[in-house]
Structure formats: structure tokens, C-alpha cells
Amino acid sequence: MVRNINETFLKACKGERTDYVPAWYMRQAGRSQPEYRKIKEKYSLFEITHNPELCAYVTKLPVDQYNVDAAILYKDIMSPLPAIGVDVEIKSGIGPVIENPIRSMQDVEKLGEIHPEEDVPYILDTIRLLTAEMLDVPLIGFSGAPFTLASYMIEGGPSRNYHKTKAFMYAEPKAWFALMDKLSDMVIAYLKAQIQAGAKAVQVFDSWVGTVNVADYRIFIKPAMERIFAQVREMNVPMIMHGVGAGHLANEWNDLPLDVVGLDWRLSIEEARTRGIHKAVQGNMDPSLLLAPWNVIEEHVKGILDQGMKQPGYVFNLGHGVFPEVNPDTLKRLTAFIHEYSKEQLAK
């Protein structure tokens, strides 16, 4: 049975007019929710993602609590890496840690291929469960982008400056492009499998690409992104690109065969469009604002919505993930305000 879903989010991604501005929040399922924190007392992130019923519950929780217009699958960008031979551990207070970092072409050549139905069946089963039985809004699948995945694989974990990653990129270009090719193959297969399982849109997170300048992006990263989006495009679902601190790359993303350019708070929607961004836009509230008094939040959100609504194709989101300290009631109130205010303004 095919479930009827609210397609407002999908319409906005395609640049179509909507009755109100759709909203969802990165990390909407996570540490800000008391129910999630209780689950995390018993289970690790990977244990949750390996349990389709539990993972589906966590994914759906913010949809029920906040009335958002899309769900995003609960998992980590590192989830597919063990399938290609990368030993990943998520350490509390640190993040992903990789014991066997990439240091040479030989290390790159050891990486394998992903076969999603065999390697990550639990992720695909979670998608099938959510889309067949549980959700009344679209489910977003996602992947990390090759640069960000490579940065973890080379640094061995999170970094403040990504010196090792960029040094490898400059000093070992042959190995770098081989790594980009292997990761691109993985991302393409991984995203296609999520769509085949029922995801109605996909987002590619390039969390750390903001550390790279435009010239280097064009040489070392953009070809891989062009290949990913060109090949996933044949699946005919909206594709979203998002990075942090990457406003200087927005025009590069605008050139890619994708549907939605994700912005963080450093580049306003108005400025992005002035620069020639003609695709749908997603963003771009500073998540720190969620810790401010409501009257401050409301004033800022009005300003963001007023910019976003100037043309069709706008999805409200944060510029980064929800902080653990955020009160869930604030997110519920925020969604209601976005819906009410935008509906009123768009009806004029």
C-alpha cells in the first residue's frame, strides 16, 4: 500500500509554489529530546541504527512532536564506511574516531565497495518500515560527501583545521582522486539504495568543505560532486546540498545538477539570490538563536521567512544541527509559527 503523504516539502524542493513554508531541522531527532536521551542510556548510535524498529521510532519522534514537514533518517554520515573497510567508532564527547587513517595510495587501494542490501540492510529496512507504515511526511535519506568523509578517514577523527586532509590533497593528488572516486562510488550506491527503499529526497552533507577555497574546490572536489548528483538524478527525487561555513561555495553548488542549495547563517538568503543562486534554497537560522527568548527568536525568524518567501522554492531549516540544550517546546512553537506566519503572508 502506498501511503498518502504531505508533499509540501517536496514541492518547495522542486521550486513550486506552496501554501506555507515547509520546515524541518537538522538533528531534529537527537540529544534535545528527553525520549532520545533515555534510549541513548541503553544503546549506542550504531546499536540504534542496527535496530530498524528502534531507529524508525527515533526518526519519527520529531515529526510527531514538532509537526515538521519532513523526517530525516536517524543515522550518522559514518554509517556506510565499515562496509568499505573503515573501522569507525563513535566516541562520546569526541565524535567519529578511525583507527586506521588513510596515509597512502596503498591505503586507498585497500578500500572495498559497498553493496547496500548486504552491507547496510538495517538502514534500508528502517526506510521501508517508515515509508510503508509510519510516516505521513516525506523521508529524507542522506550521505556524507566525499570530502568530509575523506577528512575523517585521513585525520582519524574530528579536526579543527584539516591540515592532514589538505596536505594529502596537495601532496598526493593521484591518491586523492582515487579516494574521491572510491567514495563517490560508495555515495552513489548508498543514496540510490535509500531512494529505492522509499526515501523521497536525499541530502548530501559536506560538513567541513568550508575549509577549502573556491579554486581548490573546483579542482579537487567538484568533479566528484558532479558525478554523484548526475548519477543520482536519474532516481528523480529532490537532491539537497548542505555544508557549514561554505557560503563562498554556494555558486559552485548552484552549477551542480541538484535541486536545493542549503545555506548556513553566514550567508543570507537575499545575498545568495543576489549572487545568482537560482535553485530552491534551504536554511538558514543560526541554531544558537534557539537558546534565546521567544520574542528574539520570532523577530529573527520573520526576517528569514520574509527573505525566503520572495520567490517559490524555499524550505526553512537551521544552518546546522539542533543543540542538545534546546528545549523541545521551542522547536514545536517554532514550527507552528513558521507555518502560521508564512501561510498568512503567502495568502496576501
Swiss-Prot record:
Binding residues annotated for substrate, in chain numbering: 27-31, 46, 76, 152, 207, 320
Keyword Phosphoprotein: no
Domain of life: Bacteria
Pathway per the UniProt entry: Porphyrin-containing compound metabolism; protoporphyrin-IX biosynthesis; coproporphyrinogen-III from 5-aminolevulinate: step 4/4
Compartment list: Cytoplasm
Keywords noted in UniProt: Cytoplasm, Decarboxylase, Lyase, Porphyrin biosynthesis
Enzyme Commission number, as recorded: 4.1.1.37
Record bears the keyword Heme: no
PROSITE patterns per UniProt: UROD_1 (PS00906), UROD_2 (PS00907)
GO biological process, one term: protoporphyrinogen IX biosynthetic process
The protein's enzyme class: lyase
Site (described: Transition state stabilizer): 76
SUPFAM superfamilies xref list: UROD/MetE-like (SSF51726)
Annotated Pfam families: URO-D
GO cellular component, one term: cytosol
Catalytically driven reaction(s): uroporphyrinogen III + 4 H(+) = coproporphyrinogen III + 4 CO2
GO molecular function, one term: uroporphyrinogen decarboxylase activity
Physiological role: Catalyzes the decarboxylation of four acetate groups of uroporphyrinogen-III to yield coproporphyrinogen-III.
Subunit structure: Homodimer.
Assigned protein family: Belongs to the uroporphyrinogen decarboxylase family.
Record protein name field: Uroporphyrinogen decarboxylase
Species name: Bacillus cytotoxicus (strain DSM 22905 / CIP 110041 / 391-98 / NVH 391-98)
